[in-house]
Amino acid sequence: MRDVQNEKDYRGIYLRKVGIKNIHWPIKIVTKSGDYQSTVASIDISVDLREDLRGTHMSRFVEVLNGIDSLHPENLGKILQEVREKLRADSSHIKISFPYFIFKKAPVSQISSPNMVECVIDAELSKKLDMIIGVKVPIHTLCPCSKEISEYGAHNQRGVAEIYVRSKKLIWFEDLVEISEKSASAPIYSLLKRPDEKYITEMAYNNPKFVEDVVRDIVSELEKEPKISWYRVEVTSFESIHNHNAFACVEKGWVKK
């Protein structure tokens, strides 16, 4: 049978990434407590392609995924090495995006309910392994200006905090979620009874924050972790009384121009 992918290509153009995108795959994630959580991920996986080869072998990417029992940031290097070897490439890349559930107890009733966050692992293996992990966490913000100028009440709304980090040692998703929530006016819960709603409403009112405040508070916490070598933080507030969203962002290493 003719092997079209392995035919010679004479255009002399090296391709940085070739592979498959947005394949939905069942995975098991190792949690901070040592348990496993089953979820469904959207996965992009690729390799580089030499300038003298016409194509890569797409089915081999799925073969690698088919052999993965569980995912953990610490075993991604082994997975990427297998991808690189199977496809005879110099570099390999994988991006895994998935919903992740953290159980939280309501502040007064203590009723536990699952709360979803979006997680991502973005890793590349070339001469060495480079990996970024990230979370998107729903949060609650209350406007300090609105509180200051109003006789009573203040506009408040849901928002989302995004944190992406490079780390010399393992950082758990749960730790990034905790940093996001404690930097906001108040956390978000799936299930709240009336005493819980009263508690959270008053908590946010007593802790007003701009998106700028939330970003800076998150960064202050990340800077306490010497194992974090790089980060990017963005907070978006879905403004309740404006026809726009508000946002602020920062990346470690940015220089003021």
Curated annotation (Swiss-Prot):
Record-annotated site: May be catalytically important: C143
GO biological process: tetrahydrofolate biosynthetic process
Catalytic activity: GTP + H2O = 7,8-dihydroneopterin 3'-triphosphate + formate + H(+)
Highest taxon of the lineage: Bacteria
One Pfam family in the UniProt entry: GCHY-1
Enzyme Commission number(s) from the entry: 3.5.4.16
Pathway as given in its UniProt record: Cofactor biosynthesis; 7,8-dihydroneopterin triphosphate biosynthesis; 7,8-dihydroneopterin triphosphate from GTP: step 1/1
GO molecular function, one term: GTP cyclohydrolase I activity
UniProt entry keywords in alphabetical sequence: Hydrolase
TM regions (residue ranges): none
HAMAP family cross-referenced by the UniProt entry: GTP_cyclohydrol_B
NCBIfam families: PRK13674.1-1
Family affiliation: Belongs to the GTP cyclohydrolase IV family.
Function: Converts GTP to 7,8-dihydroneopterin triphosphate.
PANTHER family, alphabetized: GTP CYCLOHYDROLASE MPTA
Protein name: GTP cyclohydrolase FolE2
